[in-house]
Amino acid sequence: MDIDNFIRAKGAIFSAIRTMLSSLDFDVSMIDDVYVAGGIGSGINMRNAVNIGMFPDIPLEKFHYIGNSSLTGAYLMLLSTAAEKKTYELASNMTYMELSTVPTYMDEFVGACFIPHTDTGMFPDVMKDQQNRK
C-alpha cells in the first residue's frame, strides 16, 4: 500500500507540472528554476526524484530547496508591512487551477504513474543513464 501511495503522489506531482506547463503553452525546456518547499524537499535526492519521474528531466542545478516557505512567509508578514504588501501583490497575480477539471490531466496522471513515465522520451537523460549502466 505504501508503494501505491508513493506512485500516486509521484504521478500527481509530475502530471500537475505537465498540466500547468501545457496550459501556458510551455514545455520543460522553458523552466528556469524549480523551488521545492516543505517536508518533501528536505530529504529528497533530486537525481533519484528525476530518475523515477517525479520531476521533469532538467539539469539538477535548476532545483532549489527553500525550506518551510509558508512558515517563513507568515513570519515575515507579521514583522514587515512591506513583506505583507508584497505577499498580497503576489497572491493577486496567481491563477488557481483545478487540475481535475482539465480534460488532459487524468491522461497525464495515468502516464506519470509508471517509472519514469509511459513516455520515456520525456526523460532522455534518465534513459541514457540507464543504458550506460547496462
Language model features with spans:
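Helical "lid/coupling" subdomains associated with nucleotide-phosphate turnover
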Residues: 1-134
